[in-house]
Design a protein with these regions (language model features):
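Catalytic metal-binding core of the metallo-beta-lactamase
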Residues: 1-110
């Protein structure tokens, strides 16, 4: 789910960077994507677990809507422990965005 992770990471980092709480940010993203059933289900799952007091890492790791790359999960885990969530989310968003562009270019070249 590269493009999805890129979008999620960029949106979440933007809200968190503005000083918004993670739960509020997840709710806003969920409201913006309510018409996308699978993505909305993913966000609702995250929101529920975060409301229960679980970390973003735990919520991402426990949800079953999308498979998450291990390096993404571990990056989020370290970011949560070190207080560097915004820069890590920005880097992850950029990484997945670049990866999607390269994949598209390779597909077009073939």
């Amino acid at each position: 789910p590269g493009p999805l992770l890129s979008s999620f990471a960029k949106e979440l980092s933007s809200y968190l960077n503005s000083g918004m709480a993670i739960l509020t940010a997840i709710r806003l993203i969920e409201d913006q994507h309510q018409h996308e059933k699978k993505y909305a289900s993913f966000l609702a799952s995250l929101r529920t677990m975060i409301e229960e007091g679980k970390s973003l890492y735990h919520a991402l790791n426990s949800q079953s809507v999308y498979g998450m790359p291990d390096f993404f999960l571990q990056s989020i885990n370290v970011a949560g422990q070190s207080g560097k969530m915004v820069p890590v989310l920005i880097q992850m968003g950029n990484f997945f965005s670049t990866q999607a562009k390269i994949k598209k270019q390779v597909g077009n070249a073939l």
